[in-house]
C-alpha cells in the first residue's frame, strides 16, 4: 500500500552509502533540490515531507546508533575486529573524543532536520490553503523538531536553539532547561493539533499522530524525572484505545507489524536501496551466510543472560548461529567471531546478531526496507508503569507491566509469571529490567541507565566515567566553526 514512505521519494536526496568500509565516514547528503520557500499547498506538503526525510538520512538512522546501544551493556561494536575500529570502536569502550569521526555528522543531520522544520513553521502559515491541513503540517513539523531537539539534548545537554531557517551564524548554547522548554512547547502543540492514528490511512499512513506526540512527551518527562507529567501523557495514549500489543513479539519490530497496532511512530522505508530505503538493518545484518549485512551492534553476553529462562523474547532479539529463520540457516562469518571473557576469565567465541532487524530477502542489497520503530506501545506501557510506581501507585503500575509480560510469555503459563511486588524500590528495579529485555537493541538502554543514575555502576566496568560520559562531547569542528561561541561540555 502506498503511504508516506513512498511519498518521500519526491524529496530528492543523494543516498551515498554502499559499503561498510565507509561506516560513519560518508559525506553529508545533499540539500533539497528545490531550495525556494514554499508558496503553494503542494509546496507545503513537499516541505513537510522533507522534514520526515531526515529520519532516513544515513547519519540519523544508522550513523547515530553507536551512540545508543553500543554505549550500553546490551551490545558491542561487532563486525570484524578491524572494521570501523577507529570510528565505531571508541564508543564501545568510552574512548571517543570531541574529534570523533561521525559525531559531527550526527549533530549536523539533526540540525538539518530542524532547519527543514523551521521552514515549514515559518512559511506555511502564509500560504492560502485548507486551514486544517495547514495546521496539521505545522504540527507535524513541530513534532519532528521536538524529536530532533530531544535527540540533541539527551546526547549533548543544552544546545543552540534555532527556530528560524536563517539564524545568525554563531548561536550560543541554550541551557538544558531552555532546550527542554522548546521541546515541550513543540510537542504540546503537536499533541493538541495532530489527528489520532485511526484518522490516517493510505498516503498518510506513518505520519506523526496525536498519540506519537503524547508518547514522546511521556518519554521527555520521564527523562526529566517529572513522573506526574510522564504518567499523564502515557495514560493519554493508553486511554485513547488507538494502540495495542502485537500477538507475536517478533512482529513488534518485523515487517508484519509495520504501521500495526503496536507502532506509535516508525521510520518508513522500502527495499529499493534508494532514497525510499535505509540501511539500518543492513548495518546490523548477519555477516557471512546468509550475507544480510555488516554485523555491527552485536548483542552482548550480558544481554543474553538478562533474559529469564524460556523467555521467547531472547530468540526474538538475538540471532544465534544454527538458528533457522524463514527457512534460512544462520551460519554467520566464522572468520570474525566475537571474543568475550566470562566471569572466570575464560575467553569464549560467540557470534550473534540483532534479530529485530531481520528482513526476509536474498542478499545485502535487499536489506533497505526495515521500518525502524521509534516508539512502540510496549514502551508506552512500561513508561506508564514506571511513572505510576514513582507516583506511589504500585498496584496500577503492575497492570501495565504485566500486560507486557503476558504478551511475552506467548500463552505459556509456566514462564514469566505476573509480577506482584509492590515495594517501590524493588518494583523500580523490576520495571527497569523489563524495559531492558523488552526493548533491547532498540536504542533505549543507555538513556535508561543515564536517567536512572545506574550508568556508573552498570557501565563503569566498560569505561564509563561518572560526570563525563552521561553526555557526548560537542563536536570540536562545530566549536571551531563558531569561533568559540559554542562551549564544550565539562570534563570533555
Where are the regions that the model predicts?
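Bacterial N-terminal signal peptides
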Residues: 9-18
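Long, intrinsically disordered, low-complexity segments
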Residues: 20-23, 41, 52, 75-82, ...
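An aromatic- and glycine-enriched ligand-binding surface/loop that stacks and positions planar moieties
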Residues: 21-87, 188-194, 207-339, 459
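Conserved, well-structured interaction surfaces
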Residues: 45-59, 81-156, 173-177, 187-199, ...
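Flexible, polar/acidic helix-loop-strand segments at domain edges
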Residues: 88-95, 309-377
Amino acid at each position: 500500500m502506498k503511504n508516506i514512505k513512498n511519498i518521500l521519494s519526491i524529496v530528492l536526496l543523494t543516498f551515498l552509502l554502499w559499503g561498510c568500509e565507509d561506516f560513519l565516514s560518508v559525506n553529508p547528503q545533499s540539500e533539497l533540490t528545490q531550495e525556494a520557500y514554499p508558496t503553494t499547498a503542494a509546496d507545503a506538503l513537499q516541505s513537510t515531507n522533507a522534514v520526515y526525510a531526515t529520519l532516513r538520512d544515513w547519519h540519523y538512522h544508522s550513523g547515530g546508533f553507536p551512540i545508543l546501544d553500543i554505549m550500553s551493556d546490551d551490545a558491542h561494536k561487532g563486525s570484524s575486529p578491524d572494521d570501523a575500529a577507529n570510528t565505531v570502536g571508541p564508543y564501545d569502550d568510552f574512548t571517543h573524543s570531541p574529534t570523533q569521526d561521525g559525531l559531527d555528522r550526527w549533530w549536523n543531520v539533526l540540525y538539518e532536520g530542524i532547519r527543514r522544520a523551521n521552514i515549514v513553521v515559518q512559511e506555511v502559515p502564509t500560504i492560502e490553503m485548507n486551514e486544517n491541513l495547514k495546521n496539521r503540517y505545522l504540527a507535524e513539523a513541530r513534532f519532528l523538531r521536538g524529536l530532533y531537539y530531544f535527540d540533541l539534548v539527551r546526547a549533548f545537554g543544552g544546545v543552540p536553539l534555532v527556530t528560524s531557517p536563517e539564524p545568525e551564524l554563531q548561536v550560543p548554547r541554550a541551557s538544558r532547561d531552555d532546550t527542554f522548554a522548546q521541546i515541550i512547547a513543540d510537542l504540546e502543540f503537536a499533541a493538541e493539533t495532530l489527528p489520532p492514528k485511526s484518522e490516517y490511512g493510505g498516503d498518510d499512513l506513518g505520519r506523526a499522530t496525536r498519540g506519537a506526540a503524547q508518547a514522546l512527551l511521556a518519554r521527555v518527562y520521564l527523562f526529566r524525572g517529572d513522573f506526574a507529567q510522564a504518567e499523564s501523557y502515557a495514560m493519554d495514549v493508553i486511554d485513547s484505545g488507538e494502540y495495542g500489543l502485537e500477538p507475536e513479539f517478533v512482529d513488534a519490530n518485523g515487517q508484519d507489524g509495520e504501521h500495526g497496532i503496536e507502532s506509535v511512530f516508525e521510520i518508513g522505508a522500502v527495499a529499493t536501496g534508494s532514497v525510499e530505503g535505509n540501511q539500518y538493518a543492513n548495518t546490523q545484518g548477519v555477516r557471512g551466510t546468509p550475507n544480510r549485512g555488516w554485523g555491527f551492534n552485536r548483542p552482548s553476553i550480558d544481554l543474553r543472560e538478562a533474559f529469564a529462562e524460556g523467555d521467547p523474547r531472547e530468540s526474538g532479539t538475538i540471532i544465534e548461529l544454527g538458528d533457522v529463520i524463514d527457512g534460512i540457516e544462520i551460519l554467520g562469518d566464522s572468520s570474525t567471531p566475537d571474543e568475550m571473557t566470562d566471569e572466570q576469565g575464560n575467553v569464549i567465541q560467540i557470534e550473534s546478531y540483532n534479530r529485530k532487524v531481520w528482513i526476509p530477502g536474498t542478499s545485502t542489497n535487499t536489506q533497505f526496507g526495515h521500518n525502524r520503530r521509534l516508539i512502540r506501545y510496549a514502551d508506552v506501557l512500561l513508561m506508564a508503569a514506571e511513572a505510576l510506581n514513582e507516583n506511589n501507585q504500585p498496584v496500577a503500575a503492575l497492570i501495565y507491566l504485566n500486560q507486557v509480560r503476558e504478551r511475552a510469555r506467548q500463552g505459556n503459563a509456566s514462564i514469566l509469571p505476573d509480577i506482584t511486588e509492590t515495594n517501590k524500590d524493588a518494583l523500580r528495579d523490576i520495571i527497569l529490567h523489563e524495559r531492558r529485555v523488552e526493548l533491547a537493541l532498540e536504542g533505549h538502554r543507555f538513556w535508561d541507565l543515564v536517567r536512572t543514575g545506574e550508568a556508573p555502576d552498570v557501565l563503569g566496568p566498560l569505561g564509563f566515567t561518572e560526570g563525563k560520559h552521561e553526555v557526548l562531547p560537542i563536536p570540536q569542528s562545530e566549536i571551531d566553526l563558531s569561533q568559540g561561541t559554542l562551549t564544550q561540555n565539562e570534563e570533555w
